[in-house]
Amino acid sequence: MQLEDARAVRRNDRRDRTMTDERKIPVLRVTPAEAKRALLVLAGVVAWWCASWLAIGPSMEPRGPVFAVYVLLFVATFAGHYVARFPPLPPLFGQLVAGFVMRNVPGLSEAVGEAVDARCSSAMRTAALGVILVRAGLSLDVAAVYRLRWPAARLAFGPSTAEALAVALLAKPALNLPWTHCAVLGYLFAAISPAVVIPSLLRLQDKGYGVKAGVPALVTTAASVDVVYAIAGFGVCAGFLVTAAGGGASSAAWRAPTQIVGGALLGYLAGRALGAITPPDRKVSPSVGSPDAFRAWEVPGETPARRAAWLLGMSLLILFAGAEAEMTGGAALGVIVASAAAAREWGALDAKACGGVLNVLWNDFAQPLLFALIGAAVDVSRLSGDEVGAGVGLLAAGLCVRGLVAFLAAGGGQLAFTERIFVAIAWMPKATVQAALAGLPLDAAIAYEGGDKNGPETKRAEVILALGVLAILITAPLGAAAVAVSGERLLKKAEASDEESNEQ
C-alpha cells in the first residue's frame, strides 16, 4: 500500500512538473484556435496589401516607403504577441527587436529597413509621442499626487536628477560629446517606463504584495510625475542642441523658462477650453410648472471616442507647432498639462473612459509602430564598438546612482528596508519614453544639416539614438523580470482581512 502511494506521489510530481514546464514554455503548444486565428490574420494582411498595392502602386512594392511601414507594423505586432507569451517580458521588447532586425539583416534591410522615409518616420514617431503624452496627462491623479506629495516628489525628482547628472558628467570623457548632448543623453536615460513597471506591479498587487504599505500606489503616482519631469527636462535640453551648434547658445538660454512657462500656460488654457466644449453627459431637470416637471432627462455629451479624437488632434497640433518653433520641450509639457486639465473638467469616470480609447489605440497601433520605427532607425554599421561599450558603462553607472538615490528617497516613511530595495529595483526599467524621445535629436540634426548623414551633428545624434535603444534592450526585459521575481521576496503579503479593508 505504501509502495503504491509512493508511486502515485511520483506520478503526480511528474505531471505537475510537466504542467509547469508547459506553462513556462507556452510557445511549444499552439492550439487549433490559435493556428486558425493566425491564418485569418495573415490572410487579412495579404488582402490589405493587395488592395493597397492596386490603389497606390509602386509605394506598396518591396523597397517602397509605404510597404516598409506596413511590413514593420505587421512584424512588430506579431513579435509583440509572441514575446507576451513569456511574462513578465513586455511586448515592446519584441517589437523593438523586430524593427532592429529589419534594419540590420542583409536582404531585409534593403527591402524594408532602409526604405522607410525619414520624414514620414519622424512624423509617425511624433504622433506616437502624442499618444504617450496624452495618456500620461489623463493618468496623472492630482489628488493622489497631493496626498503622497512628499514621498512621491522625492522619488520622482531625486533619482532622475541624480542619474541625469551622473550620465552627463561621465558622457563627456567617455564619448567626447559636447555638454549639450551630454545633458540630453542624461535626461534620455532618466525616465522610468510605466509600460514595463506597472503591469508587473499590478500582478503583485492582485496577489496582495505590498498593498498594506502602499507600495503600488506610491510607485504608480511617482512614476507619472517622473515621466513628466524627464520629458520636460529632455525637451528643454534638446532645444539647445542645434542652436548651440549654430553659435546661438546665448539666444537659446532664454528658451528654457519660456518653454516651461509658455507650454504649461498654453496647455492649461487649451485643456480647459477643450473640457468646456466637450462636456460629459448630464441630467437636466425641467422648470417647475412644465408638463415634464417631475421627469429629468439626460442631455448627451461627447462620447469617449470623440473626446479622445479631440484631445489627440489638439495635442498633435501643439507638438508639430512646437517642433516648427524649435520648442519641443514646451510643447510636450503643454500636451501633458492640457490632458490633465481636460481630465479635471470631464471628471474621473469620463477621463478614464477616454483613456481606455487611447489605450486601445496605443496597444494595437501606436506602440508596435513606434518601437519598430525606433529599432529600424539604428544602423549598427555606423556605430563603433567603443561607443557601444561606453554606452553600456554609462547605463550601468547611471543605474547604480539611480538605484541608490531611489532607495534613499523611499526612506523616511512607512516602507521597510526590503520594500525600499524593491522600489529601487522598480525604478530601473526604461522603454516607452526612450523610444519616443531618442529619435528627436536625429530629426533635428538631419533638418539642420540638410540631410547630410555624415555631418557632425547627425553623427552625434545617431550615438544618442543608439544608446537610447541599447538602454531599452537591456533594462526593459531585465527590469520586468527583476520586478516580478523580487516582488514576492521583498514585499510583504497582506492578509485576507487587510486586503478586504483596502478594497473597502
Specify the residue positions occupied by each region the protein language model found.
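Non-transmembrane, juxtamembrane loop and terminal tail segments
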Residues: 2-24, 288-293, 494-504
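Transmembrane alpha-helices that form the ion-translocation and gating core
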Residues: 75-86, 107-112, 142-210, 273-276, ...
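Membrane-interface junctions of multi-pass transporters
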Residues: 55-61, 83-90, 99-151, 278-393, ...
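Structural signature of hydrophobic alpha-helical transmembrane segments
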Residues: 59-73, 117-133, 180-193, 255-269, ...
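Small-residue-rich segments of transmembrane alpha-helices in multi-pass membrane proteins
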Residues: 95-106, 154-168, 221-232, 304-320, ...
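Alpha-helical transmembrane bundle and helix-membrane interface signal
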Residues: 141-147, 198-221, 225-261, 284
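N-terminal membrane topogenic signal
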Residues: 26-42, 88-91, 303-305
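Hydrophobic core segments of alpha-helical transmembrane domains in multi-pass membrane transport
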Residues: 43-53, 74-81, 99-104, 234-238, ...
